[in-house]
C-alpha cells in the first residue's frame, strides 16, 4: 500500500491552503507508509486515543509533525469505522453462507416432498383403479408375487460378501437420507431456521423407529465424520463401541465390524447391544458417508457370557452423509433407523422403544447438537468461567453421566453383583468390590482396608407429574429430600483414609446452597455446575473448620423449552478439579412414557402459584393447560452410590437402603404437590395454612399500601378480592410478604417475586428475610426499622439482594410497609422490589 487516504477535518475558517503544512485543508490528505505504520502501532494499543494522547503522539513522532491534531482524530475515526465495517461484513458473509446452505437444504427437502407427493398421487390412482377392477387387481397382485425375485442373502463370512453388504447398505441409507424410502414427517416442536439445530423428521408407518436430521455445522467434513464415528463421546446411552475387524474398500473407504453396547435407561428394562457392519467411503461429489446396519445372527460380537445382560437389537441401514459447503463448513444428514425389540420390556415401558421421537431426541439431534457445540468451541464462540477449557468441562459431564449409567445398569463385567435384601424389594442393593474411587496418583489416601462401592437404586412410575418441573424442584430445593450427613459422608471419602458411618460426627445443614454455573450446551439442554452446601458446626471447636460440601452437578432438560426424552439431575462430591478426580455419581432420571405429550408440561413454572388463578381461571387451567399433564406418565429412576470398607459393608448397605427409601417418600410428597391435579386455589390455601385466604391477604396488602403511602398499589383496587388477587399475582414488580416475627420468614410472593427469588410457593417458607439481603442491604433495612414501625412504611435505596439460588439481583428501589389485618393489628410485612433484574 503506497499511501493511505484520510479526509482532513474541516477547520473553523472553512478550509483553504495551509502555508505551514503545504496541504490543502479542503481536500484529502495523503499519508506516507511510514506515517501509516506509526499510526497503526498506536491504534493496535489504543483504538480510541484521547486528545492528550494524540498531542503526545505528535510530540513523540517527528514523522507526524506536519499533520494537525484534527487530522489525527479523523484518521482514528476512519480507522475504527473501517474496522467495524470489516467485522460487520465478515459477520454478514457468515450469515449469508449459513442462509445459503439452509436454503439449499430446504430446496432439497422441498424436492423430496414433491417426489413423495407424486408417488402418493400415483399410488392413489393405482388404488382407485384397483377398487374399480377388483378381480383384475387380484390377479395382477398374484402374478407380481410369483415373478418378483427375492434378494439373495449375502455371505458375511468373507470380505467380498461384506463389501456387497456394504454397497447395499450405502444405497438403502442414501434413499432414506435424501430420498423417499421412508415417509418422513416433521417432528413437532422442531422448526427449521438459521438458529435451529436443523430440519428434524421422524418416520411414519415404517418398520421399527426412525429419525432423520439435517443441518449446517461450521466444521470440515473429515472432522465431522471423526466426531460422529466416536459414538460414546456424544451419545450418553452408549456404553462401549469396539471395532473387531477392519477391511479396506475402494475409494479409500473401510468396512468395519462393530460391536456396540447401550446402557439401560432404567432398572426395569435390560440393556441393548448391536452387531453391525459400518461402511465409510467418499462419494464422487466429495461427500463423506458413514453407513451402518446390523448383521444377521445373534452370535456376533464378544463371547455369549459377556452379552447375557443384553437384548440384541437391530440397526437397519442408518448413518451420516456429510457434504462440504461452499465457503467452509459442512451440511450433515443423519439417519437413525432401529428395531429395539420392544417385546422384551414391560408393556407400560414399551413407548420408550416404539417412539421415533425418542430416537430423534436421544440420538439424532444429540449428534447434531454435539458437533454444533464442538464447532462453536473451536471457533472461540464459547468461553467459560474459571479459565476452564470446554473440552475439559465436557469430559466432566461425560464422566458424571457415565458413572450414573454404570450404577443404573450394574453390569456383571464391571464387577457389580446383587446383594440380598430385607424381604422388601422396593430398593435394589448392588455391590462392586472392584471399583476404586481414588486414582493411582492419590494412592497416599487410598482405603486402608479392602472395600468398594454399594449402589442403592429404585424405579417408580409417576402419574401427572411434569418431569422438567420435578427435576427443577429437586435441583433448587435439595433440603426437601437430601440428608446433609450423607452428603458429608460421601465427601469425606475423598479426603480421608477411612470411611466412617454417618451419624458418628453429626452435622447440621444451614439450608443454604450456592449454585455456581460452569458450562452449558448450545441450547441449554445440559448444564454443568458446582453446588456449595453450607454446613453449620455443632460445637465451638468445629466452627474453626470448614464444613462446606462441594458437588459437581449435571442437569438435563430443566430449561423451560426442553422437549427432551430424559430429564436428569446427576451429582458427585468433589474436592478439587484435577482431571483424575474420582466421581461417584448419584441422582435422578425422569423419562416420559407418553410421547404424544412431550414438551407439553415443560413450560410450567416451578411455583404452585398457578393456584392463585382463582375462579374461572382455575377451571380453564385445569381444563386446558393441565389436561395433558394430568394424564402424563413417566418413570423415575433413583440411584445413589456409597463407598464402603469391607468390615462396614452390611452397615453401609442398610444405611443406603433406608436413605433411598426416604428419598422415594420425599419425591412422592413433592410429586403430589407439583402435580397439576393438586394445583388450584385449595392447594394454595394448604401451602399457606395458618394464614388468611390468599384473596383476603391480597386485599389487606393493597389496603395497607394505600393507607400508609396515600396512593393505590394497583390500577383498579375497587374490585372484588379474587380480582385483586389476580392483579397482584400478575403485578410487574416483585411483591413479597414475610412474617412479623423476630426472624421473619417469607409467607407469600407474587409471580414476579417467585421469579426473583428463584423459588416456588412450596419452598418459599424456607427463605428468611435476612438471607436475601447483602450486607449493605441489611444495614439499610435495619437502620430504617424504627422509621418503618413509626410511620408504617419506608423506602429503601437501590441495591443488590440474593435469590434463593445464590444469584445476585439488582433493584432500582424497594418499598416496605406494614400489612394490617381487619383488627388493625400488624399481620405481616410487605416488600415491593421495583425494576429488579439478575446481575
UniProtKB/Swiss-Prot annotation:
Segments forming domain START: 155-383
Expression (tissue specificity): Expressed in stems, leaf sheaths and blades and panicles.
Region Disordered: start-end pairs: 1-24, 132-157
Chief location of this protein within or outside the cell: nucleus
GO molecular function, one term: DNA-binding transcription factor activity
Coiled-coil region list: 91-134
DNA-binding annotation, residue ranges on this chain: 24-87
GO CC list: nucleus
Keywords attached to this entry: Coiled coil, DNA-binding, Homeobox, Nucleus, Transcription, Transcription regulation
Compartmental location: Nucleus
Role noted for this protein: Probable transcription factor.
Family named by the database record: Belongs to the HD-ZIP homeobox family. Class III subfamily.
Name of this protein: Homeobox-leucine zipper protein HOX10
Record organism: Oryza sativa subsp. indica (Rice)
Amino acid at each position: 500500500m503506497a499511501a493511505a487516504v484520510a479526509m482532513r477535518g474541516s477547520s473553523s475558517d472553512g478550509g483553504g491552503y495551509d502555508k505551514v503544512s503545504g496541504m490543502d485543508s479542503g481536500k484529502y490528505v495523503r499519508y506516507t507508509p511510514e506515517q501509516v505504520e506509526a499510526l497503526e502501532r498506536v491504534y493496535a494499543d489504543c483504538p480510541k486515543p484521547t486528545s492528550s494522547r494524540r498531542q503526545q503522539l505528535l510530540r513523540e513522532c517527528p514523522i507526524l509533525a506536519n499533520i494537525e491534531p484534527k487530522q489525527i482524530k479523523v484518521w482514528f475515526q476512519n480507522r475504527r469505522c473501517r474496522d467495524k465495517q470489516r467485522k460487520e461484513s465478515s459477520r454478514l458473509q457468515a450469515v449469508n453462507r449459513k442462509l445459503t446452505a439452509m436454503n439449499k437444504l430446504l430446496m432439497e427437502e422441498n424436492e423430496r416432498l414433491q417426489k413423495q407427493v407424486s408417488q402418493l398421487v400415483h399410488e392413489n390412482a393405482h388404488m382407485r383403479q384397483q377398487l374399480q377392477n377388483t378381480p383384475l387387481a387380484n390377479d395382477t397382485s398374484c402374478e407380481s408375487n410369483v415373478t418378483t425375485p427375492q434378494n439373495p442373502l449375502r455371505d458375511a463370512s468373507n470380505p467380498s460378501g461384506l463389501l456387497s453388504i456394504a454397497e447395499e447398505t450405502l444405497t438403502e441409507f442414501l434413499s432414506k437420507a435424501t430420498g423417499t424410502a421412508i415417509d418422513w414427517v416433521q417432528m413437532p416442536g422442531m422448526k427449521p431456521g438459521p438458529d435451529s439445530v436443523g430440519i428434524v423428521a421422524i418416520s411414519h408407518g415404517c418398520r421399527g423407529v426412525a429419525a432423520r436430521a439435517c443441518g449446517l455445522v461450521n466444521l470440515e467434513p473429515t472432522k465431522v465424520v471423526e466426531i460422529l464415528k466416536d459414538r460414546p463421546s456424544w451419545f450418553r446411552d452408549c456404553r462401549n463401541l469396539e471395532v473387531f475387524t477392519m477391511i479396506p474398500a475402494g475409494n479409500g473407504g473401510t468396512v468395519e465390524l462393530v460391536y456396540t453396547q447401550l446402557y439401560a435407561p432404567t432398572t426395569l428394562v435390560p440393556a441393548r447391544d448391536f452387531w453391525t457392519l459400518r461402511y465409510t467411503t467418499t462419494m464422487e461429489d466429495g461427500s463423506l458417508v458413514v453407513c451402518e446396519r446390523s448383521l444377521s445372527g445373534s452370535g456376533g460380537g464378544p463371547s455369549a457370557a459377556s452379552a447375557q445382560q443384553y437384548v440384541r437389537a437391530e440397526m437397519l441401514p442408518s448413518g451420516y452423509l456429510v457434504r462440504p459447503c461452499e465457503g467452509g463448513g459442512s451440511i450433515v444428514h443423519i439417519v437413525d433407523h432401529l428395531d429395539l425389540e420392544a417385546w422384551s420390556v414391560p408393556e407400560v415401558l414399551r413407548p420408550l422403544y416404539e417412539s421415533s421421537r425418542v430416537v430423534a431426541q436421544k440420538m439424532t439431534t444429540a449428534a447434531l447438537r454435539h458437533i454444533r457445540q464442538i464447532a462453536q468451541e473451536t471457533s472461540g464462540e464459547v468461553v467459560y468461567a474459571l479459565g476452564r477449557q470446554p473440552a475439559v468441562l465436557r469430559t466432566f459431564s461425560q464422566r458424571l453421566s457415565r458413572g450414573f449409567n454404570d450404577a443404573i445398569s450394574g453390569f456383571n463385567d464391571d464387577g457389580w453383583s446383587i446383594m440380598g435384601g430385607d424381604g422388601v424389594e422396593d430398593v435394589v442393593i448392588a455391590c462392586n468390590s472392584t471399583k476404586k474411587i481414588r486414582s493411582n496418583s492419590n494412592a497416599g489416601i487410598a482405603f486402608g482396608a479392602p472395600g468398594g462401592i454399594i449402589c442403592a437404586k429404585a424405579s417408580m412410575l409417576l402419574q401427572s407429574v411434569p418431569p422438567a418441573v420435578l427435576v427443577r424442584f429437586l435441583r433448587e430445593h435439595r433440603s426437601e429430600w437430601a440428608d446433609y450427613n450423607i452428603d458429608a459422608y460421601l465427601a469425606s471419602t475423598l479426603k480421608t483414609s477411612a470411611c466412617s458411618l454417618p451419624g458418628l460426627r453429626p452435622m447440621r445443614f444451614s439450608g443454604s446452597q450456592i449454585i455456581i454455573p460452569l458450562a452449558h450446551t448450545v441450547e441449554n439442554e445440559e448444564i454443568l455446575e458446582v453446588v456449595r452446601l453450607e454446613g453449620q458446626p455443632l460445637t465451638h471447636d468445629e466452627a474453626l473448620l470448614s464444613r462446606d460440601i462441594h458437588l459437581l452437578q449435571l442437569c438435563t432438560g430443566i430449561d423451560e423449552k426442553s422437549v427432551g426424552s430424559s430429564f436428569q439431575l446427576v451429582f458427585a462430591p468433589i474436592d478439587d478439579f484435577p482431571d483424575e478426580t474420582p466421581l461417584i455419581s448419584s441422582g435422578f432420571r425422569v423419562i416420559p412414557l407418553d410421547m404424544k405429550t412431550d414438551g407439553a408440561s415443560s413450560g410450567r413454572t416451578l411455583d404452585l402459584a398457578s393456584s392463585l388463578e382463582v375462579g374461572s381461571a382455575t377451571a380453564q387451567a385445569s381444563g386446558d393447560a393441565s389436561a395433558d399433564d394430568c394424564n402424563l406418565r413417566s418413570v423415575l429412576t433413583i440411584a445413589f452410590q456409597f463407598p464402603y470398607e469391607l468390615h462396614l459393608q452390611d452397615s453401609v448397605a442398610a444405611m443406603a437402603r433406608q436413605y433411598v427409601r426416604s428419598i422415594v417418600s420425599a419425591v412422592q410428597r413433592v410429586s403430589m404437590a407439583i402435580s397439576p391435579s393438586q394445583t388450584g386455589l385449595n392447594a394454595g390455601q394448604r401451602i399457606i395454612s395458618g394464614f388468611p385466604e390468599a384473596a383476603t391477604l391480597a386485599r389487606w396488602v393493597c389496603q395497607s399500601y394505600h393507607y400508609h403511602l396515600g396512593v393505590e398499589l394497583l390500577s383498579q383496587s375497587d374490585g372484588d378480592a379474587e380480582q385483586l388477587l389476580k392483579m397482584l399475582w400478575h403485578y410487574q414488580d416483585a411483591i413479597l410478604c414475610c412474617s412479623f416475627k423476630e426472624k421473619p420468614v417469607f409467607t407469600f410472593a407474587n409471580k414476579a417475586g417467585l421469579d426473583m427469588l428463584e423459588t416456588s410457593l412450596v419452598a418459599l417458607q424456607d427463605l428468611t428475610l435476612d438471607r436475601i439481603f447483602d450486607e449493605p442491604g441489611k444495614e439499610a433495612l435495619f437502620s430504617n426499622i424504627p422509621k418503618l414501625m413509626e410511620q408504617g412504611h419506608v423506602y429503601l435505596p437501590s441495591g443488590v439482594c440474593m435469590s434463593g439460588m445464590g444469584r445476585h439481583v439488582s433493584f432500582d428501589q424497594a418499598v416496605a410497609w406494614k400489612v394490617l389485618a381487619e383488627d388493625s393489628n400488624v399481620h405481616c410485612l410487605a416488600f415491593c422490589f421495583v425494576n429488579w433484574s439478575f446481575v
